[in-house]
Amino acid sequence: MIPKAEQAHWLAAALALLIGLLLVAELIVGQEVFRKRAWRSHLFPAAVIASSVLLWVITIFSTFSTLHLLAHAIWAQAALVAGAVELALVRGKLRSPRWSLVPAFALFVSGVAFLVHEQYAWLYSRSAFLHHAIGWMLVVVALFPLGQALEPRRVVWRAGFALTFVLLAVLLFADRDAAPIFGRFGPSGP
């Protein structure tokens, strides 16, 4: 059974919320305390890689159009590369804070893919509105990991990066395929 698009979006939202809460928890208690147990340091990269695998599964089932297939494949590949780099950083294989440029690039490319794959205008439907909102959000929030690469000690960059995934989850949870844009004020009128 292939889930409906909104159910796949809700699953992605749950995973994005998990990733965001992991990053917020690490931000609150500090990296030293959070990573005292080795397994906790691997949670974020593992969740990102798991999201990549799920995106590849969705790519297989997104037979709506070639554009949807390519967009999901780009998101899956961006998540896989970002997760792999984060895993290498956690394991000590990579050391430079400049590797934070990879998640910045992944967020930017994902945002552009969101914008390109939505063929309808902002106010066509709730789904179109959310795709545009998520796309522009991802393009803008790519500045957080970029700032983290340039100034790794500033907390604002880590906080922004963590809250990016929480906001992404909120937007994805709002997705309903056949819903009007703003509650009862849709194409059917008030």
Per-segment meaning from a language model:
Residues A12-V24, V48, I74-L89, I134-G147:
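Hydrophobic cores of alpha-helical transmembrane segments in multi-pass inner/ER membrane proteins
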Residues L55-F64, F114-L123, D175-A179:
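Juxtamembrane "helix-exit" motif on the non-cytosolic side of transmembrane helices
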Residues L171-P190:
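Juxtamembrane boundary at the C-terminal end of a transmembrane helix
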Residues L43-F61:
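A generic, lipid-embedded transmembrane alpha helix
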Residues E32-V48, R95-F105, R153-L163:
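Membrane-interfacial loop-to-transmembrane alpha-helix junctions, especially the N-terminal start
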Residues F64-A73, W122-A133:
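Non-cytosolic membrane-interface motifs at loop->transmembrane helix junctions
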Residues M1-L17:
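Hydrophobic transmembrane alpha-helical segments in integral membrane proteins
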Residues R98-H117, R126-G147, R158-L171:
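Alpha-helical membrane segments in multi-pass integral membrane proteins
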